[in-house]
């Protein structure tokens, strides 16, 4: 028997050896030897033999284009396999820690903390909490769907190897299966030859919801049930705690390919998928609920519900009675499956909404409890009921999104027919016009009349015209949110309210079928958040719409664009302090705030450990409801493996429960005024340094020459263009390719640059430019103290999380590799910018370790601990990429190799944008 315990080193060794054999078979012995030579030389270089770098460069540049492609493919495939081995190790660690009772951030630890409160407070916390992960189609996933499917098969085989009772023959067969998959993977194109369509992106998101999260959510609820029961000495009702949402197939911002037809197809496919999942669940439940009607009393309420179904579906009822003559629960379940079949069908008798299905499940549960079958309810009925409450009839509710300028232009063109020059109106005049139009009974524009409009404006009106039909067909909850990119004025929100009103989606004061979500992503918008939201809350039309939506306002914060505009430290501070301001304005108007965090996968775009981010939010903003984006490769990493998905969901719930309790116990967190002043000072100086870099003459050319941005723009990662207008400026470039490019060059500038400038400004006593007492950057006689920064790090979760995230970016930065990219650039640009970046990096290293009082930069990060192992395998890909970028004219095979190096480096860094 193969009863040994596998370890990651064994997995890495055996997978590496297997890849070597595949390389010999599929390429040649010579190719294998060239790859091995590059690997050994890279290891020697990382071991301190500095001359080895020149040898590595010479070896790779001396290869033929064919062998360069083989080397690139070999290292890329290696990382794909090693990432699977690391995933398996994560699962093993989770299982071991769980078994030993040492699992951090578990539901048990959250329940233990909740147990300190009285029963009413515990129930309040649970009732307040709603977590809404929102899957987006943002193009940061560099792998093809076909490649991901093969990797999942290999992952399944690795999981099988962890079983203790495999015979030697069984283990040999598993390795033969892995060999076959790796061979197939080698022979499969690694890079997309076409741009994915929005339907592809929607199907990708759907896969994780259908195949992982549908089952995982039920398991998390079960764990929470057990944990609460153990700590709280009273009956506690566990409400709906999760709601999954998606932008895939409905996010139109900058993507002309997301049409009403795409959105309609996505809605229909998602409903079909979830209804089939429920039918399967009810069929399995029917295998359990075989109770004899002569031995139990189902109860009058159950019998009445069954009789109503018989009247709705007489033909199906006769079939059910003939098949299950003495089994009332099976009869009921058979008719419930038939009603699911008829949802959205022309045939009568289907469920009108998900509440009817929930009512049927609760009726069965009540009947079973009355007959002493509580264990059957807990083990079989409650899990289905919670799945239905979580996923509804839509699998994931869709959010619509578009740029505010599109709405402004569409309204201006439509109103021009009535002789109204909307573009000439002031902001106050626009607010007045839109408010009056919403409050009056008669429509102002005809959404169906689009012949004389521009293409973009016609698309906007067609969308709102379709929205009412979608809500009628699929239910309001299937598509009930509209996010507005680049919101900077109250009129930008009222424009969407106006269009929704003209479509009949809103009919005030009684009904509003849509949450309108301002996306605040520029410094102007963030600093003006109080002005924007205050105007809206006091507006007659908007306040009625808000009341019709339960007096809850969702506000989205854009981490990506604010970071690109202001730099890492200034963006984080602006988001933090403006969240506090938003919390205050919502409290002043008795509005429940739900913050929507537009976070990317990388630190530079708001990424980092989600549980730590939730606990670092200002207490005054933690209402219990929270929403955040899940993007690109982060979706696969977090939700591809069921056990890891469960762990991520568990950590989110742990953090949100604890954060809500903390907010109730202490509505205002204990943050000293001098800390806030220090942060203002640091952020202001950091922003000045960052903007000075970006606005320096020649910087955009340096960025173009010292990163692979031109390659990334052509990679077919997503269905939308890399820049909003097609131009190459830092302002217009989307945040994802901006971050992706710096990550590829190993500089990772957006994740840490100007942090040191900010901290040094505080230590040297430089007054912030925003200070009322200062007309410019002046120096005070008394500088700041490193001791206070250390105290802030120890006692202020926001500051600690910010520095820890910067440390994570710094730990992944490699300026020796980045220098090779800089050397491609014009020598004058290189000398000006790379030296400046290097000086800031070195000072940041000193300050991070001093403030955090630690010897190592980021010892707590699991990936950071493995960088030493990974670097020798990423280095050859970087060297090869630099060599190919230097070529003025590349052959077709060199272009394909260059694109493959991008994919390989992304796999090696476990990060794109």
Language-model region placement:
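Often metal-dependent polyanion-binding catalytic scaffolds in large enzymes
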Residues: 1-427, 456, 831, 835, ...
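Acidic, glycine-enriched catalytic cores built around paired aspartates
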Residues: 2-6, 13, 24, 50-74, ...
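Generic, well-ordered alpha-helical scaffold segments in large soluble proteins
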Residues: 18, 22, 38-41, 74, ...
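Secondary-structure-rich domain cores
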Residues: 203-204, 212-245, 250-253, 462-480, ...
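Structured alpha-helical segments in the cores of large, soluble enzyme domains
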Residues: 119, 123, 129-154, 174-190, ...
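Beta-sheet entry/capping signal
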Residues: 239-241, 245-247, 255, 385-386, ...
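Conserved short loop/turn motifs at secondary-structure junctions
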Residues: 400-404, 481-489, 515-523, 599-602
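Catalytic or ion-translocation cores adjacent to nucleophile or general acid/base/metal-coordination motifs
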Residues: 258-289, 502-688, 889
């Amino acid at each position: 028997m193969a009863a040994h315990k596998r370890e990651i080193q064994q997995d890495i060794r055996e997978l590496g050896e297997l890849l070597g054999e595949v390389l010999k078979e599929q390429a040649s012995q010579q190719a294998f030897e060239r790859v091995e030579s590059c690997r050994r030389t890279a290891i020697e270089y990382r071991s301190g033999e500095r001359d080895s770098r020149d040898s590595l460069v010479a070896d790779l540049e001396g290869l033929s284009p064919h062998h360069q492609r083989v080397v690139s493919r070999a290292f890329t495939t290696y990382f794909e396999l090693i990432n699977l081995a690391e995933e398996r190790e994560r699962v093993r660690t989770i299982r071991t820690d769980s078994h030993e009772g040492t699992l951090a951030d578990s539901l048990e630890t959250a329940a233990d903390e909740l147990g300190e409160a009285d029963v009413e407070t515990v129930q309040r916390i649970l009732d307040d909490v709603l977590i809404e992960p929102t899957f987006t189609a943002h193009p940061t996933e560099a792998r093809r769907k076909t490649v991901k499917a093969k990797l999942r098969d290999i992952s399944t085989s690795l999981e099988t190897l962890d079983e203790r009772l495999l015979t030697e023959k069984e283990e040999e067969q598993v390795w033969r299966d892995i060999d076959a998959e790796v061979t197939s993977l080698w022979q499969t194109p690694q890079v997309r030859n076409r741009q994915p369509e929005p339907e592809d992106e929607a199907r990708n998101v759907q896969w994780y919801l259908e195949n992982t999260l549908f089952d995982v959510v039920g398991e998390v609820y079960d764990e929470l049930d057990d944990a609460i029961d153990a700590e709280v000495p009273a009956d506690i009702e566990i409400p709906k705690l999760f709601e999954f949402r998606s932008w895939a197939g409905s996010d139109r911002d900058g993507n002309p390919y997301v049409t009403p037809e795409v959105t309609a197809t996505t809605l229909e496919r998602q409903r079909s998928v979830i209804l089939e999942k429920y039918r399967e669940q009810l069929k399995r439940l029917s295998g359990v609920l075989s109770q004899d009607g002569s031995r139990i009393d189902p109860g009058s309420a159950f019998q009445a519900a069954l009789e109503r179904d018989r009247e709705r579906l007489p033909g199906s009822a006769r079939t059910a009675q003939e098949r299950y003559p003495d089994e009332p629960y099976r009869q009921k379940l058979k008719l419930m499956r038939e009603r699911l079949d008829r949802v959205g069908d022309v045939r009568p008798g289907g469920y009108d909404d998900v509440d009817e299905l929930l009512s049927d499940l609760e009726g069965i549960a009540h009947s079973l409890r009355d007959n002493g079958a509580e264990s059957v309810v807990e083990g079989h009925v409650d899990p289905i009921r919670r799945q239905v409450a979580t996923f509804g009839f839509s699998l994931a509710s869709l959010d619509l999104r578009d740029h505010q300028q599109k709405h402004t232009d569409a309204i201006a063109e439509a109103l021009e027919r009535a002789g109204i020059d909307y573009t000439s109106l002031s902001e106050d005049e626009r607010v007045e016009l839109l408010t009056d139009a919403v409050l009056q009974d008669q429509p102002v524009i005809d959404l169906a009349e689009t012949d004389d409009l521009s293409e973009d404006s016609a698309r906007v009106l067609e969308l709102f015209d379709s929205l009412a039909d979608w809500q009628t067909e699929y239910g309001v909850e299937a598509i009930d949110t509209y996010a507005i990119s680049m919101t900077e004025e109250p009129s930008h929100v009222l424009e969407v309210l106006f269009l929704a009103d003209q479509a009949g989606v809103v009919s005030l004061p009684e009904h509003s079928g849509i949450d309108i979500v301002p996306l605040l992503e520029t410094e102007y918008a963030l600093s003006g958040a109080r002005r924007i939201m205050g105007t809206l809350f006091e507006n007659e039309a908007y306040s009625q719409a808000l009341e019709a939506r339960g007096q809850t306002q969702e506000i989205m914060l854009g981490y990506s664009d604010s970071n690109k505009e202001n730099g890492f430290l200034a963006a984080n501070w602006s988001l933090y302090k403006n969240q506090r301001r938003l919390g205050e304005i919502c409290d002043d108007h008795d509005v429940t705030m739900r913050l929507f965090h537009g976070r990317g996968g990388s630190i530079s775009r708001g990424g980092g450990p989600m549980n730590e981010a939730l606990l670092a939010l200002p207490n005054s903003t933690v209402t219990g409801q929270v929403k955040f984006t899940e993007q690109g490769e982060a979706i696969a990493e977090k939700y591809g493996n069921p056990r890891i998905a469960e762990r991520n969901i568990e950590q989110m719930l742990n953090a949100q429960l604890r954060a809500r309790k903390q907010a109730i116990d202490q509505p205002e967190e204990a943050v000293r005024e001098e800390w806030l002043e220090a942060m203002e000072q640091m952020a202001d100086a950091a922003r000045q340094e960052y903007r000075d870099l970006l606005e320096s003459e020649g910087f955009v050319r340096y960025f173009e020459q010292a990163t692979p941005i031109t390659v990334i723009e052509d990679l077919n990662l997503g269905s939308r263009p890399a820049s909003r207008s097609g131009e190459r400026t830092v302002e217009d470039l989307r945040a994802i390719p901006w971050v992706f490019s710096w990550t590829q060059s190993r500089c990772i500038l957006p994740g840490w640059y100007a942090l040191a400038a900010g901290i040094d400004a505080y230590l040297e006593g430089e007054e912030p430019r925003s200070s009322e007492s200062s007309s410019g950057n002046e120096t005070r006689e008394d500088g700041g103290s490193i001791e206070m920064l250390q105290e802030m790090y120890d006692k202020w979760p926001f500051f600690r999380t910010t520095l820890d995230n910067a440390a994570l970016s710094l730990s992944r930065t490699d300026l020796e590799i980045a220098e090779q990219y800089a050397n491609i650039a014009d020598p004058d640009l290189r000398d000006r910018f790379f030296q400046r970046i290097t000086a800031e990096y070195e000072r940041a290293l000193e300050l991070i370790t001093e403030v955090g009082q630690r010897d190592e930069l980021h010892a707590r990060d699991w990936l950071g601990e493995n960088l030493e192992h990974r670097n020798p395998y990423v280095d050859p890909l970087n060297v090869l990429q630099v060599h190919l970028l230097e070529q003025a004219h590349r052959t077709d095979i060199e272009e394909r190799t260059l694109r493959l190096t991008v994919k390989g480096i992304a796999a090696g860094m476990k990060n794109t944008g």
